Design a protein with these regions (language model features):
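SAM-dependent transferase fold signal centered on methyltransferase-like domains
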Residues: 1-406
Length: 406
């Protein structure tokens, strides 16, 4: 079997215009080894043992129940993105595993055709079983190498409205294929789980995969996200595409970014550096790096090259928030979204209560109190979704310490 032999007809407004030769059915897993779980409104067949493994097993399909929150965010992000779209809606998932994300998209979002791909035949068989369990007719399966699958959707009029890639490790080797398969005005969603690389344990590997290097700080997760975004934006620019972040989210196991893709040259200059002073704690995102801290004159540490633009698009976040009542979604999503709306216009590089308290050798203030003090003194301030004790502000670090110590 040569895997995907699919194409979309030039006029693909009707469901019967989609043609795909799917891999044969080969499910050999005993039904006693399976469990049916429900995410949102979707039933998903999962091998019992797969839910216990920390890495994808080779002999059975992998499922990560801890990623449910990520899939919840995806559903409301995709729903918000597609809400006013009039052209045909096509969702592509290059590394679908058991198909949890694609199954939910096909079952919970209306008027969309879902194409999922994986190299694991057992995963695909379970994916097909789950599709039948949910009565899905808009769910199509491919067994192929990722870029071969995406190449079938890389021509004009044939691209995905939403393209998703969720690998175990770094997504870097798939990004060009994903970008080529994303339509003009489409959405690219990308996950990364190689946190040790992104957090500075393997800088050579980080430079190869993400075109930059991190530094270890209290806001290392923001640096990691900006490295991922910088890599995607740089690859897109080389293809004469403009990639713009509109939403990012994270937990302790992964980073996930969402970017709008336009088929036009990128004329922006938003790849730069984050500079951090170990002596005074000043930090900033800049296009041109400097050796010395502008506040205290000490040597600075530099992370990058990376994305120095905004992480969020406020209008899109508001639209996501409006979609929440339509779906069965974890309540944490609303809490996170409200924080992202508050921080969407704030500067890069958040602070944490503990780092300020440690620098002053005092007890931390409450997050609400420091934000109130900053605002009362004429500064902008907000919590951040990236850290429960983090806050963003345009206040200089020396003034933050002064207000903290009052």
């Amino acid at each position: 079997m040569d895997g995907l032999t699919a194409h979309l007809a030039p006029s693909h407004t009707r469901q019967d215009k989609y043609e795909m030769t799917e891999p044969p059915y080969r499910l050999q897993i005993n039904q006693d080894q399976l469990v049916t779980i429900i995410e949102g409104r979707t039933k998903i067949l999962v091998p019992k043992g797969a839910m216990e493994d920390k890495v994808p097993p080779r002999d059975i399909a992998f499922f990560n129940p801890r990623a449910r929150l990520s899939r919840d965010f995806s559903i409301i992000a995709y729903s918000a993105f597609l809400k006013d779209l009039e052209r045909p809606k096509i969702f592509l998932d290059g590394l679908s595993g058991l198909g949890a994300r694609g199954l939910r998209v096909a079952n919970e979002i209306s008027d969309i055709q879902v194409f999922v791909n994986d190299a694991n035949p057992k995963a695909l068989d379970l994916s097909r079983e789950s599709a039948e369990l949910n009565g899905l007719k808009n769910y199509h399966i491919s067994e192929n190498e990722v870029c071969r699958f995406l190449s079938a959707f890389s021509s004009e009029g044939n691209r995905g409205t939403i393209v998703d890639i969720d690998p175990f490790g770094s997504p870097s080797k798939y990004i060009e294929c994903c970008l080529r398969a994303t339509s003009h005005g489409g959405l690219l969603s990308v996950s990364a789980t190689d946190l040790q690389v992104l957090h500075g344990l393997f800088n050579d590997a980080c430079k190869k995969k993400y075109h930059g290097t991190p530094i270890k700080t209290t806001y290392s997760n923001e640096i990691a996200i900006r490295l991922i975004l910088g890599m995607i934006v740089t690859v897109a620019a080389r293809l004469d595409l403009e990639a713009t972040p509109i939403f990012v989210e994270t937990n302790q196991h992964y980073y996930r970014v969402y970017l709008r893709i336009l088929h036009k040259p990128d004329t922006r200059n938003l790849i730069g550096f984050i500079q951090h002073c170990r002596d005074c704690g000043n930090r900033c995102a800049v296009v041109e790096s400097a050796a010395k801290c502008k506040l205290c004159g000490s040597e600075q540490q530099t992370a990058g090259p990376l994305w120095v633009g905004t992480l969020y698009e406020k209008e899109f976040l508001t639209s996501m928030l409006a979609e929440l009542p339509k779906y069965t979604i974890d309540k944490k999503c609303e809490k996170t979204l409200r924080k992202t709306i508050l921080e969407s216009d704030m500067p890069a590089c958040y602070y944490t209560l503990d780092e300020i308290a440690e620098a002053l050798k005092t007890s931390p203030l409450s997050l609400q109190r420091i934000i109130e003090r900053l605002e009362q003194n004429g500064f902008a301030a907000s919590p951040t979704s990236l850290n429960p004790t983090g806050f963003r502000t345009n206040c200089p670090i020396d003034k933050i310490k002064e207000l903290f110590a009052q």
